[in-house]
């Protein structure tokens, strides 16, 4: 589906999107901002980059449905095919409006509800991140495909955790989570660049307790996974795509690790871990009294089926 030749052409398309976005960024005037029905900002850059991206991907992949932030509305009839594209022409529109360089162009190809290819381009630096052949890559400005460098997550040191988040979306739940895990550093970064920093091994966790849309994170998810990390829900299951209204709930993006401490996920739900652990131990004790056992499901953080342990 994604061949080397297709990657080269997608990168060329991303560079065209970068040029368009940067052109508008340099001459941007806040008076030109419009607002959508949900009160989110819309700029000329959003519209024009979207047109370039959609036209380019339709030309390369004529039979694959494209879901774009700027084309989607609640009445959209999603075909939920085997493959579909998720596009965010300007991820971090607030950063763009406030003249911050941290906005991106995002493309993601989804297969069976999981992202298999992602590309994130940062117009202000010309940097492009993408994944291909189960590896994550970084391409600096004015370089061609052959100059791409492999990037990888670093193993998480739980005694020296490094986190990042967007201070524009800082909730009480997120503040509580940060106080609980006690990172040695917490960077404020907008847009999907957060996933790129994770993929490069610069940080360990990106927690999110406020809503996002699938096109916000799918490209970063794909790149991060190829770099050795992942994006999971508060139940410990990998985030899926093609959900109702393309809306994400709470998630935790992480670097390379064998296991995420389940107390991190419990706290992400804003639950008291001590009370949760106490209730869990009491439930286990009651199960043992009745000679019952629990069969785990896909997630180890929830109960599955209950049956007798008697032979």
Question: Which role fits each region the language model picked out?
Answer:
Residues 65, 184-185, 230:
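Conserved beta-strand segments of alpha/beta enzyme cores
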Residues 68-70, 190, 235:
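Short loop/edge segments at beta-strand edges and connector loops
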Residues 148-220:
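Phosphate/pyrophosphate- and phosphate-bearing ligand-binding catalytic cores of soluble enzymes
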